[in-house]
């Protein structure tokens, strides 16, 4: 019977707690250590239901109750009520529906969901945590048919009056299948602290799958040294469970976080061409990824066997996409399949060439769709049942959306000023550097790669410097460079040996004009020396002066853009955000309790990252995956990424101000709002990025100060120190001896490290990801793959003659073919899409309707952060309307919105999610 329906007389009766059932087990806890505190700040509370009565002692207890003026004794028992919010699947297949009905039936006969409250206190006599009796949640069977995505169930506890504050709740799911528990709220008249909130957001497995109970802690944060005595051992046990023992094959229902090398990108059992080196270890240093424990391949004991689509790859259960995200990603994946399937079928049944025959054929991808543009005969098309089905059911999916790069000026991509603008306001604005040494110099071994000096001379660029000498232009910070020479040169022989792939190692020099815009003034295209130590074959091209030089200049810019696309995807996007963040996420779950205040800070910035990285290993960066098949580097893609990690990646320089200073595009200046002065004043990525960087830094510093008043509290926090130590020594273990790792000794150190991590997960990733289709979906603007070197009369006279006869066709034949282009477009369209459940920077952090923390001061600090983010967005909007900022405002010029924090769902070319979620 419902407690809320009790009469006064019944409410005065003694309530006997239910006797423990066999098999529930006993929780043992360490006693309170002398001098330890339980908490310092006010808490956020919110009632969830009608008042729950306190149950008084019975008359037989000998306690007298009384009339007017008599002091009423404290009751022996109090009633507490829990409300559990369970999220249902929006779409259930027949099997799941049947399982749901079976669970409802099992619930009626006692195989139900059982709860137990655990107090923050220990019992003075037993020295064990105070616990409630076990109770079952109500109405599971009756609410099976309830409408809505969320269902609220209730449970009622009776506890001793001195039970204290519930600090944890244990859940045993005795149904046959898992359920997603969003939150629990416990309230009652006997709680001096008010309602207690538990933000769960977790899958609770059946005890058949996982015999142990799940434990959830309240939203009140505690440093390890301040953990209430009733929760100490439980806190340690939960972390031990999450770490696992490093053995065994992981099941999809597991919650274990552990490390492994990238030894699953290749598939040697499939053939020699699918062998890939292991990334991670002394030979090829690399960050670690989440361990799955799969058995080795048959032909290489060091390589892990693969899980191929559509089978899921392991991530800890709560890291998997939630249903809204999964639905959006599946929809995007479906679109990718459709876009890729059609060209594949056409390639197999048509005798026609599959180069684009003209720019209008590329345009038709957005107008008429794949089927119509290729002129495939109708009767032949109808002979393929699957295609006919697609035609009938998904006609709209056969047509690509028009990329933003074409929306305001269809021919902008042809101009030099747009080519240069994208170096500071495009999808990869993080490689431009100030030129400080002329000619540019390579850092590669000259005994192998020849003399280090660039082939670009002052003669090449003197006429483009507005009367300045090269030295004067460098002194005035007028010369900048995008240098991919060393990133590509060691791999070019292997790349160029692949049929249909050709690349140079490129350098591009830009001049900063009086208008504040850049213009390209020289492009160097280098190939490896024929023999070690010999001079490199190089071409230097400058702005064109006639028809032939104009086409050669266009081809040179295409090679630069292709280099840029590869470095963007392999280094800046994948390595510097996705891969390098994963060890910090793994270590956070392994070493910091859910009640740790720093875990609470980082939690929204870790959402979905392990899942998207696992999907990348399965389909994107694997042997013959999307990256290898669509980008020029092909099979050496992983090695290019690893070379940057070994030679250039430094965590201490990954924060925005440090990165800008490292590249020479900014100098320290305490008089400036963000502490740096930009040498390219109209640098949209840096301008907007500094707004968000400063907002993040202020928020993190305020939050850290709430919990760490001095260096001692940082140094004595064993969970915090364990997280950072393992992130370096295991997760980034190949670079653990590097001298540049920041210390973690003071609150300032901690705030700096956390600011960098939040920046990388949110703004930096957004700037590099969500413009991929809007800015790269028109392949001639940023060809991911090039199939021809520049024509050379001495190397191939016939090819040069063909170029002169039809330069338009030569250019298009150098671009990706129809299959490569459409496959690439489909993938980056998916990667550029915001899901409906995206959580954006500065938005509310409450989880399932439950406050993310019970600390009012932390909530207030986050409110100030949200206001800072809103102001940043308003500033970005004003900048995009400022005609003085020519890199983001003007005739046909796209606004720079990649760091505008908010966004609707879909491909929007804006929006800063909290985490690396796609």
From Swiss-Prot:
Single GO biological process annotation from the record: fatty acid biosynthetic process
SUPFAM superfamilies, per database record: Lipase/lipooxygenase domain (PLAT/LH2 domain) (SSF49723), Lipoxigenase (SSF48484)
Disulfide bonds: none
EC number, UniProt record: 1.13.11.12
Keywords, in A-Z order: Dioxygenase, Fatty acid biosynthesis, Fatty acid metabolism, Iron, Lipid biosynthesis, Lipid metabolism, Metal-binding, Oxidoreductase, Oxylipin biosynthesis
Family: Belongs to the lipoxygenase family.
Enzyme class, spelled out: oxidoreductase
Catalytic reactions on record: (9Z,12Z)-octadecadienoate + O2 = (13S)-hydroperoxy-(9Z,11E)-octadecadienoate; (9Z,12Z,15Z)-octadecatrienoate + O2 = (13S)-hydroperoxy-(9Z,11E,15Z)-octadecatrienoate
Region of interest: Disordered: 56-76
Protein name as catalogued: Probable lipoxygenase 6
